[in-house]
Amino acid sequence: MSVFTGWRAALRIARHDAMRSKGRSALVVAMIAVPVLGVTALDVTYRSVTPTTAEQLTASMGSADALFSDEDIGPILQLPDAERYEQVDENAPVDEDGPSIDVTTTFPKGSRAISIQSVPAGITTGYGIATTEIYEFRTSDPLARGKIDLVRGAFPHGKDQVAATEPFLKSTGLHIGSTTTVRNFGKKYTITGVVEQPDQLNVEALYADPGAVIAPWQARADHDKKVLPPNVGSKEWLVKGPEGVGVTWPDVMAANKSGVLVKSRQVVLDPPPESEIPLARKGVEAYPDSSGELSAALVTVVAMAILEIVLLAGPAFAVGARRSRRQLGLLGTCGGDRRHVRAVVLGGGLVLGGAGAAAGVGVGLAATAVFRPVIEEWAGNRFVSISLNPMELLIIAVIGLITGLLAAFAPAIVASRQSVLESLTGRRGVRRSSRVLPVLGACVLAIGCAVAVYGGTDGNSTLVAAGSVTAELGLLACIPVIVGFLGRLGSRLPLSPRLALRDAARNRGRTAPAVAAVMAAVAGSVAIATYMSSAMAEAEYNYVPVLNEDTVVISAFDDKAAARLPQARAAVERNMAVTGGHADFRHAWAGSDCNVYGDAENECGSVELVKPAGEAASCPLTGKGAKELAARLTADEHKKLMRSPACLVGIMSSGVFNAGEHGIVVADEAILSTYVKLDDPAAAKALAAGTPVLLNPVFAKNGEVTIKAVHAYSDKDKQGQKLHPGKARTTTDRLKVYVAPEKYAATPGINMILPRKTAERIGLRTQVSGSVYAVAHPPTGAEEQRTYGAIEQSGGGIWTQSESGPGGIDNSMLLILTLFAGMVTLGAAAITTGLAKADAEADLNTLSAVGAPPGVRRKLSGFQCVVVALTGVVLGTLAGLVPAVALRMVDLRQALQMMRMEPTESAYTPIVLPWTTLGLLVVGVPLLAGLLATALTRSRLALARRAG
């Protein structure tokens, strides 16, 4: 019999066995198909979400041939992709006040064009007032298709209609048919339709026809000086070139001579030779395309996913081989040898692996198509089409098929080693565990950890992936010994858990693969969850807040607006989740107030909080020798320096309380509890007595601070000039201060709180400027719009600020990972419970024969499930930490490189464990698995066929 004939028979037997045991076969197919499905969906989604060059051009210029824009720097040279350009004469001065170029004169003859120009504006909403961007862009023109598309309703036509994006409508409470007023000049517009930018679905904006907003606004501002003119953006043009010609490279270079930058579709898709590109001849190169680069995290995840498929399907094939041992024994009686037995089991892997791979690819494609709208909303851009790469899909299917074979390999070896007599009688015989395997596994585990860590320090993604997989394989080899050790722990436990532990130890051949399956699923999830938690912690640390958390600040533009602060406070208290009273603050200045008179042509006063001389008051990361110091620092040492009071001066936000860069805020003790969160009676007593409270101790020397004031007066400040004629004078005052604990140096916007009477005593002028509130949560969009609307109704001139946090940090992915790992853990535990039930039928019969109650069967199944799930989860957690730590070391290496080039860049790269995820996995999942196994196990004994 030839090799092919033998394999044909083996595949036929495997197919018949799969059809006979449909439940087990479906489980194996699902085990293989689910990861293949995920990888397929990920591949198709990535290809569909990542736009091609042609799709990017359509998103930026619609169906036009080119995008023209005036750069206002004179004649330029550009690369074909328009991403890089330079002045022809780099030394030529830029005439900012010169006449603007008529861009339309640079279009090719016979072209047609439409313009795009934007302006920020305050508009009325369903809740109050909001600020948004209004684009003057003829969205109904065919040239706009692909850049702006209609979702529902109609495009605007005429001077009193606008279209809106869906996010704008959701945030403002408006809808098609609603009217909105541009507050800046009082004109009403009707919303006629919903449009979207296919490449930016989250944009909040309004779209009007050219001339509908900017021109009437400017006309109103020209006639009414109380109306501020529109702050318009630069104008761009979508140009359709002559039919059949388009916009060519000579057209681009001709426009460059007038200072116009051109992105031409045909030039980008078919660039001219380098010899015809003047800027390229100067040595300027295009930005590199990094789309083909694979990150260390991606390589590691793919490698662990392949291993996970193998380990997940392995227990199911072990179930099949054990349940089919009588059939395999009959194969031996008919003259088959070990080679044929292995072929039958491997044939099962080939049959079920092929079915799982095909099902995974097919369902993955279908799932991507069905959930396309959800994926598009999540990604923030539309698919131009579902993009399929046949070669990649074929590789994914082949990997699924091969992993099915690999998963069946170990069960095939075990099945081929059983004697025919053992297979026919159902007896398992006695086989001692290998003493070499655990030692080898421990060595492999150590080597894998070392390789992964070295790869992390070296930034080598291949070594990180290889080391992580090697470490997991080493831990896998140690599982039989670990399971055997668990059997010794049950001597003092009640009957059911004691039997479960001993049964797991005695039957390591079926327990170990199930534990490995759980370990694989949990390891991947823990690795990703740990990496994500660490990245989130890093983002939170690096974020520089504008205000303290859960606070709202209202500030007046000038003294006239300050008179309306009581109405503004009432609006805040009525519309926001205020938790207490407010603290008022005042603006302090010397000479002429720079907020009123400060511009390029007029002089104004200044106030400065002077740092003491010496190294202690200077940040070593900003002065001379900073790079040399950074080269010697570790990440922890750099973090400590960056959070020192001296370095925080240059990091924390300023100007929030109309205080300028000096950070001196005139206020009373109420601001300590409302904003600073400093619960210190001594500090409050000091302010009440007229002693300033210093939050950043770097400005203090011997308990005193120095305030330098320049009393300069603007020519426009007639009253100041009259009272203080002559040259500007400079005063210096030393004040005793109460120094707060060092941690308060990180208070956003404030370096020192100065009592009003002390400020006036040293010659500073003060004016009530605003108030600060503590709130229960950051204001929602609706709350902000209601507050803004109420403030504008009272006369305006007051703005609100709140702290929104770092943003972009979403814990939903951690929840998804936890659910995935939990589901796989439950599945693997269910497999091993079913296998244990089949193997332990004789033991259960013996228990019943000696008088054990029926409930023992249920409890035994439950505890068997708990043993497998808990052991696998704990080992998987340990295995998952290896790649997570290694990947964070890759990030640390990159952060240190950046820090040594820019010493003030953060190198903080924490490793943070996702304790909630780990808690659910370690406690919740094994407990749930045990309860389900207990509930689903029958108490009654089934009649069994006599062995032999």
What name fits each language-model region?
Residues 481-484, 488-680:
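Juxtamembrane segments of multi-pass membrane proteins
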